[in-house]
């Protein structure tokens, strides 16, 4: 059963990590539906399978990553505000670990996506390639990304919204968001392990860890490629609508008492 749970959670991680729909929210649903008690092993599992998603980004974008130093400098600049803000506010984030915050941010983010797309319907995008992104714009995207520290926001959603507001076309906004995930998720994972080194010692079931990691990697590769093709033809409004629907699903689950807005949120 443990291996089946690992497979399902790996699929959820790969499906939701890079779509602007909140991977945290879907992990809450997934672990609750499966009846998983989030003990020390599963905490380790959820951290380690994120590395599979990171590897997927490197796999898909390796040519762009190794074209030169410029993209790495922009990613460093983009990560800087996220890292600094994270250091200062990390100890205060526990106050936000509440299901009602997830509900609010899911719905709010969905509305923002819809409004931005409607406002940009007839506008020309100014930034149409990664090379055109300035260091100032990369820094601003990092500020937007830091909003993802609020549960339910979605890291990719926050950074994509930032890109759209700065005049990036949809594909460039998504690509830079995916690439910015590399330093962000690696350092966030390393920080989690630094804070709780016992997480690695708890990762003693190699088979489910391997299943989750490989599944997250494969699914994330497919999702990234699909998503980039999708947004080259369509806008983000479907994702906005989905977020709003999911937000109301969570509202019902918390309001009815099916989910506990406090304890079950802390994965």
UniProtKB/Swiss-Prot annotation:
Molecular function terms from GO: undecaprenyl-diphosphatase activity
Subcellular location: Cell inner membrane
Class of this enzyme: hydrolase
BP terms from Gene Ontology: cell wall organization; peptidoglycan biosynthetic process; regulation of cell shape; response to antibiotic
Principal place of residence: membrane
GO cellular component: plasma membrane
Membrane association type: Multi-pass membrane protein
Disulfide cross-links: none
Ion transport recorded as keyword: no
EC number: 3.6.1.27
Keywords tagged on the record: Antibiotic resistance, Cell inner membrane, Cell membrane, Cell shape, Cell wall biogenesis/degradation, Hydrolase, Membrane, Peptidoglycan synthesis, Transmembrane, Transmembrane helix
InterPro entries per UniProt: UppP
Transmembrane segments: 4-24, 41-61, 69-89, 96-116, 173-193, 207-227, 239-259
Reaction catalyzed: di-trans,octa-cis-undecaprenyl diphosphate + H2O = di-trans,octa-cis-undecaprenyl phosphate + phosphate + H(+)
Family designation: Belongs to the UppP family.
Note: Bacitracin is thought to be involved in the inhibition of peptidoglycan synthesis by sequestering undecaprenyl diphosphate, thereby reducing the pool of lipid carrier available.
Function (record text): Catalyzes the dephosphorylation of undecaprenyl diphosphate (UPP). Confers resistance to bacitracin.
Name recorded for this polypeptide: Undecaprenyl-diphosphatase
Organism listed in the record: Campylobacter jejuni subsp. jejuni serotype O:23/36 (strain 81-176)
